[in-house]
């Protein structure tokens, strides 16, 4: 099967090609970063770049283990630079190289060197490294396949949008699993990702000794997607089930899951006071198939699964996303960009009038003129407008 073109991320690399900035792509393991590099390198070759103008190293490959020492890596690359010719340097999973920023910083000041790096966690671009490279890099976070990208893989099959959506949430959005049908293969792959992210990355980095507790916290978060919770509530619930822990431990493990880009924390935003609220947050998962895999749940709570999908799509579209807090209601998502603000309510269906009124109420309380949307699975013959609130079919919105 041909590779799915990840246009959003390819366009990011194209726009910054040959510009005097380091291109950084972060994202959870197996989301497609290495494939993105392969696609982009092929574009370079097709445009006339010669093979010896491309230096590409994947630090997951044992062949390059000796280059995980930063002096050796620097020497290897410098020896392959070509006088008076552009050289494109791709460093994949660069977090395996302690002090890689010294190599990148040194290469950056050399003429005609265009640098691209990837990493599979949030801390590989720690505050110290980010400070060292301030003003010298641009970064994009890569996610597994969007519904639109996933949908494109099934364009030749006679499937409805709804049938493809069901495959999307149950069979995973990780690129390798597209068109994989048997549950056993899907489960094995998801387990391998969890083992890598949880055991190889989080447990090792945080020196966690109670791995079962970490897995229990993951399961709790997956069972409570889209619910307002906090570390104390998680600790108390697990303790009541006989899994004794405390909020400090939960906070530490939560931070590890966020750094591993497996779980996303969405804080509350006081819509009237225009301030972030510290207590309680919602949590979403990078791929909803983990919920089915770890909890053996399929059709239950489809509303919160849909909410999870919408959250990730807003992140893909470049928004900073918050939960909107009001005195008399909650807005699922406040999506912010510079000089731009949008409000979103997400509901699987609002066919019952009481449900429609409940979902519209928080948006109706807003006294500004920013766009307001209600996203549902309901089939609409046109975009419904409820006194300035646009109701859209969520699958149509995801395919925009």
Positions of PLM-derived features:
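Conserved lysine of the Walker
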Residues: 33
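Hydrophobic positions on the alpha1 helix immediately C-terminal to the Walker A/P-loop
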Residues: 36, 40
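Domain-level recognition of nuclease-like catalytic cores that cleave nucleotide substrates
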Residues: 379-400
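Accessory nucleic acid-recognition modules appended to NTPase machines
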Residues: 183-341
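Hydrophobic anchor at the beta1->P-loop junction of P-loop NTPases
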Residues: 25
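Pre-Walker A adenine-sensing motif
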Residues: 4-18
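Short glycine-rich substrate-engagement loop in P-loop NTPases that contacts/grips substrate
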Residues: 56-85
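Interdomain motor-coupling "hinge/lid" segment immediately C-terminal to the ATP-binding subdomain
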Residues: 120-122, 127-228, 261-264
């Amino acid at each position: 099967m041909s590779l799915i073109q990840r246009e959003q991320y390819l366009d990011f690399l194209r726009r910054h090609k040959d510009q005097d900035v380091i291109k950084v792509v972060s994202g959870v393991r197996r989301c497609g970063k290495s494939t993105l590099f392969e696609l982009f390198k092929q574009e370079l070759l097709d445009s006339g770049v010669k093979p010896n103008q491309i230096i590409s190293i994947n630090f997951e490959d044992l062949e390059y283990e000796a280059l995980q020492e930063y002096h050796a890596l620097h020497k290897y690359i410098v020896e392959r630079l070509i006088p008076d010719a552009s050289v494109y340097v791709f460093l994949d999973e660069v977090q395996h190289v302690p002090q890689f920023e010294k190599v990148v910083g040194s290469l950056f000041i050399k003429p005609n060197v265009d640098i691209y790096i990837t990493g599979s966690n949030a801390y590989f671009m720690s505050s110290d490294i980010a400070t060292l490279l301030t003003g010298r890099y641009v970064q994009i976070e890569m996610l597994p396949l969007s519904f639109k990208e996933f949908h494109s893989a099934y364009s030749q099959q006679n499937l409805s949008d709804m049938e493809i959506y069901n495959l999307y949430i149950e069979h995973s959005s990780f690129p390798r699993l597209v068109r994989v049908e048997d549950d056993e293969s899907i489960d094995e792959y998801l387990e391998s990702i969890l083992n890598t992210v949880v055991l190889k990355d989080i447990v090792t980095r945080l020196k966690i000794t109670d791995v079962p507790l970490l897995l229990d916290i993951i399961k709790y978060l997956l069972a409570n997607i889209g619910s307002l919770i906090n570390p104390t509530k998680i600790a108390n619930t697990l303790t009541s089930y006989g899994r004794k822990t405390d909020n400090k431990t939960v906070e530490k493990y939560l931070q590890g899951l966020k750094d591993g880009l497996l779980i996303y924390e969405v804080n509350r935003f006081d819509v009237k006071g225009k301030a972030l609220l510290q207590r309680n947050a919602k949590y979403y998962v990078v791929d909803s198939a983990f919920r089915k895999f770890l909890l053996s749940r399929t059709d239950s709570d489809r509303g919160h699964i849909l909410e999870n999908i919408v959250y990730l799509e807003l992140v893909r579209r470049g928004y900073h996303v918050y939960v909107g807090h009001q005195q008399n209601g909650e807005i699922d998502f406040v999506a912010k960009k510079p000089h731009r603000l949008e409000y979103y309510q997400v509901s699987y269906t609002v066919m019952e009038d009481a449900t429609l009124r409940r979902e519209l109420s928080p948006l109706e309380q807003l006294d500004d003129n920013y766009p307001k949307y209600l996203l549902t699975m309901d089939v609409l013959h046109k975009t419904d407008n409820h006194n300035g609130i646009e109701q859209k079919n969520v699958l149509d919105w995801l395919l925009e």
